Amino acid sequence: MKFIDQAIIHVIAGNGGNGCVSFRREKYIPKGGPDGGNGGDGGNIWLEANNNLNTLIDLRFKKKFQAQNGQNGSSRKSSGKKGDDIKIHVPIGTKVINYQTREIIGDLIQHKQKMLIAKGGWHGLGNARFKSSTNRTPRQSTLGSIGEKRDIQLELMLLADVGTLGMPNVGKSTLVTNISGAKTKISDYPFTTLHPVLGSVNIQKNKKFIIADIPGIIKGASYGAGLGIRFLKHLERCKLLLHIIDLVPQNNCHPSDNIKTVLNELKKYSLKLYNKPRWFIFNKIDLLSVEELNQIIKEIIFQFKIHEKYYLISSMKKIGIKKLCSDITKYLKK
């Protein structure tokens, strides 16, 4: 299924039903008094998070949702039926924004969590409600109010504990696949990963974390080049970022050049994301001699003044993976 992480929908809640003007008319009761009933409330429109969904694709084809109007009141003090509500299912992690005002209405981050996005109109009052000691035959009633209508922007931001970032083809997908079993495409051409993928990493019983793999970032991404910058928002909820670095890059650049590219694009995108806890993960150590490896790591640590944790791994050969996952679990428990 195609991954869609944005949608704009137009929602119209139901109008409230009108109150009724009516008088009781029965044999032998010439002055039965007012018996006009109230109208029914208009139907509401809700969003509900569903953990069986992982895309907003359905909302790209159906953009307008209109709830049912409340029915009008009738005689014998009969109230109109309330309009039926509409419930729109969205993936967990959906951010809800008022499209016109840009106000963030809220986030849906738990299964079956509900959010009211358009409230139905109030019911109108029938004339029975206006009877008093001084007005025994009221002829007034009220109209039901208009239901809310608005445009809602939905943005899916995946919920993951850990996120991976780096240039294309640095081994992010291989790492995520090997530690979680997530089904992510792996090949030797750029942008193999076309959309974010989530994987669940189970270390031991009650010890697990969710990891997100997003498309690679290239130079100029913040100006629209490549794919990765669009999906960086999916890392905003992560508690830890893993910057995967290919020690034998296919673009014939020194690894430090690629590190600089990713960090520059990350900084341009969001300082908040740039300042998130980040570990450097040096991948493909199996393709270098010990001397070459030590020299490159020494140069990178000196150039970038790395004080954060860093790891030497081979995602293909699964070298250093167990230690990395164990340390991630410990970090997330802090």
Swiss-Prot record:
Positions bound to GTP: 166-173, 191-195, 213-216, 283-286, 314-316
Domain OBG-type G: 160-333
Domain of life: Bacteria
Domain Obg: 1-159
Binding site for Mg(2+): 173, 193
Signal peptide (residue range): none
A Pfam family of this chain: MMR_HSR1
Molecular-function annotations in GO: GTP binding; GTPase activity; magnesium ion binding
Compartments in which it is found: Cytoplasm
CDD domains: Obg
Top EC group: hydrolase
Segments of skewed composition (Low complexity): 68-77
Gene3D superfamilies per record: GTP1/OBG domain, P-loop containing nucleotide triphosphate hydrolases
Cellular component per GO, a single term: cytoplasm
Cofactor: Mg(2+)
UniProt-listed Enzyme Commission number(s): 3.6.5.-
Primary location group: cytoplasm
Region entry Disordered, spans: 67-86
Family, as annotated: Belongs to the TRAFAC class OBG-HflX-like GTPase superfamily. OBG GTPase family.
Function: An essential GTPase which binds GTP, GDP and possibly (p)ppGpp with moderate affinity, with high nucleotide exchange rates and a fairly low GTP hydrolysis rate. Plays a role in control of the cell cycle, stress response, ribosome biogenesis and in those bacteria that undergo differentiation, in morphogenesis control.
Complex formation: Monomer.
Protein's name according to its UniProt entry: GTPase Obg
